[in-house]
Amino acid sequence: MQIFVKTLTGKTITLEVESSDTIDNVKAKIQDKEGIPPDQQRLIFAGKQLEDGRTLADYNIQKESTLHLVLRLRGGMQIFVKTLTGKTITLEVESSDTIDNVKAKIQDKEGIPPDQQRLIFAGKQLEDGRTLADYNIQKESTLHLVLRLRGGMQIFVKTLTGKTITLEVESSDTIDNVKAKIQDKEGIPPDQQRLIFAGKQLEDGRTLADYNIQKESTLHLVLRLRGGMQIFVKTLTGKTITLEVESSDTIDNVKAKIQDKEGIPPDQQRLIFAGKQLEDGRTLADYNIQKESTLHLVLRLRGGF
């Protein structure tokens, strides 16, 4: 029967094979056609790397199936894995290695079972079935290893009503995960939750470890009420604009709402409250701006200073 082999360059090779051919046989045929030594070939089908001793039939590869050929570079590449204790492990890998493979190599070196490993790169937790290439992990990249402790740890979440919720979490849980756990316990949709720790609002994609939230830490849950609150903005002409906002809105957000209503670009707006000019990155809560507060809008003239 005929099968196709597609290379990373997009070239497609046609091979005459039989179901009983082993992967070794197929690699030998590719060598005959393309001159690529078998030890530099990795063949992938249906997302799985094919093992030399197995047959095409073993993998249910039928006529006109397409295999993908990835080149195994001689010597592969080195990457580093940094643990929370600060220790750095060096691994020999290839771009086509899966995250499972990498965890197995870490187990070989350090004795840590894969199911207790979480690998992070560029702020993202890496999924087992994906490859290093999928995450654009290149030579000498550094991954971060977070241990998934059996049983994790407990943290507390205190609501504005004074109620305290206990959650079972792990350091590597993201804020999204924590909000999902709160939803499971309390029925509050994640998009209505804002979590605060050490005076900072926590961002969804970050982990508890990123914020140094440890066992028995207490987070504060503020509800993002639909409709929030009203504030007023008074212009120099004496006109008053009413805005729907939330305490956690930033000054940038408020300027964008003013632009929507009045057409004034944010870079021409200066907002004043209690004699202070308000800074873009700060929130209304930072300035203790509450419902029905009045801000003053001064226009920053083009060409001004």
Curated annotation (Swiss-Prot):
Q: Which GO terms describe its molecular function?
A: mRNA binding; protein tag activity; ubiquitin protein ligase binding
Its signal peptide is: none
Any GO CC annotation of this UniProt entry: nucleus
The cross-link Glycyl lysine isopeptide (Gly-Lys) (interchain with K-? in acceptor proteins) sits at 76
Instruction: Report if keyword Transmembrane is assigned.
Output: no
Residues of the propeptide: 305
The residue ranges of the Ubiquitin-like domain are 1-76, 77-152, 153-228, 229-304
Cite the location of the cross-link Glycyl lysine isopeptide (Lys-Gly) (interchain with G-Cter in ubiquitin) from the record.
48
User: Where the protein is mainly located, per its record?
Assistant: cytoplasm
Give its localization.
Answer: Cytoplasm; Nucleus
UniProt KW keywords: Cytoplasm, Isopeptide bond, Nucleus, Repeat, Ubl conjugation
PANTHER family xref list = UBIQUITIN
Query: Please, what other remarks does the record include?
Result: For the sake of clarity sequence features are annotated only for the first chain, and are not repeated for each of the following chains.
Q: Which family does it belong to?
A: Belongs to the ubiquitin family.
Name the UniProt record assigns to this protein: Polyubiquitin
Gene name tied to this protein:
SUBI-1
